[in-house]
Design a protein with these regions (language model features):
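Short hydrophobic targeting helices and cationic amphipathic motifs
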Residues: 4-6, 12-13
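Short, Lys/Arg-enriched N-terminal segments with co-localized hydrophobic residues
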Residues: 11-21
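Sec-dependent signal peptide recognition
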Residues: 22-30
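Hydrophobic h-region of N-terminal signal peptides that target proteins for export
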Residues: 31-38
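Gly/Ser/Thr/Pro-rich low-complexity, intrinsically disordered segments
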Residues: 39-270
Length: 270
């Protein structure tokens, strides 16, 4: 219909219009991405320090808190899990992406080490006094999606209303800068959640890195494209790290059974 007024026009005169249309459609995803209109997407970032070094990789899923929400899916037990894997847990939920969740103990049940809230129900209490559970990411209440220090929640008389919550740590980035004093010796797979301080968020997993290396990477200007990391929290990693994305069909399972998962789902419109 757009070319109806050109009926009868020679093909060679129509060609520029068609070429421009095709070019626009090819560039549309990039235009939307850089304009911030894309609400959710999966991207892969790589870097290489030296000629003989391994290529480091980040699998990251970006989303907005005004269009998407966090869901927690708990296995109930690592011995007799309800789902058995991140992939199965996400597919049985309205999630478009997900990662493994918080730390858990080595007992038969895999008791969570820190706060866990699923569908508004608190499954595990807030933990205190540990570097590994220094932060909480939660969904719900007046502030919507929030990443906060555990010590701040601890000082509250009552915890805010939460639909979903996972406790983790340590913080990797605060106020846009890499946190100092992070471990620089142990390299392993890492899982994290980050925000730009506004409505833009991401979850991700990394190749084998130290906490210090991951923090420095996330805090570096342009490390995640036009997403500037204001705050980032480490979640359970190592053999627990897992990443799943419905859009791209990517599924990186954990090497062992984990206790819970953190998923991203579209906001339910009423």
């Amino acid at each position: 219909r757009a070319f109806r007024h050109l009926r009868g026009t020679p093909d060679f005169l129509l060609f520029p219009h068609r070429l421009l249309t095709m070019l626009f459609l090819r560039l549309l995803p990039l235009i939307l991405c850089f304009s911030g209109l894309v609400h959710a997407e999966h991207r892969v970032f790589t870097r290489k320090d030296g000629f003989l070094s391994m290529r480091d990789k980040l699998n990251v899923y970006f989303f907005r808190s005004d269009t998407h929400r966090l869901l927690v899916r708990d296995e109930g037990s690592v011995k007799t899990p309800r789902y058995g894997s991140l992939d199965k847990a996400m597919r049985k939920s309205p999630c478009v992406a997900g990662v493994n969740g918080g730390f858990f103990s080595a007992d038969a049940e895999g008791t969570p080490l820190g706060l866990v809230v699923q569908d508004g129900k608190r499954l595990s209490p807030l933990a205190t006094g540990s570097f590994a559970v220094s932060g909480v990411v939660y969904e719900g209440g007046r502030d919507g999606l929030t990443l906060i220090r555990s010590s701040v929640l601890r000082r509250m008389r009552r915890l805010p209303a939460m639909q979903a919550a996972i406790q983790g740590g340590p913080f990797l980035v605060e106020n846009g800068s890499a946190v100092k004093g992070l471990n620089a010796q142990k390299s392993t797979y890492r899982t994290f959640i980050a925000t730009d301080g506004g409505r833009r968020w991401c979850i991700g997993v990394s190749s084998s890195l130290t906490l210090k290396e991951l923090a420095a990477w996330l805090a570096a200007p342009g490390a995640l494209g036009n997403f500037r990391v204001e705050t980032a929290l480490n979640l359970d990693g190592g053999s627990s790290s897992a990443f799943w994305c419905h859009e791209t069909g990517i599924s990186y399972p954990a090497f062992k059974q984990v206790r819970n998962y953190l998923g991203v789902a579209p906001v339910e419109r009423r």
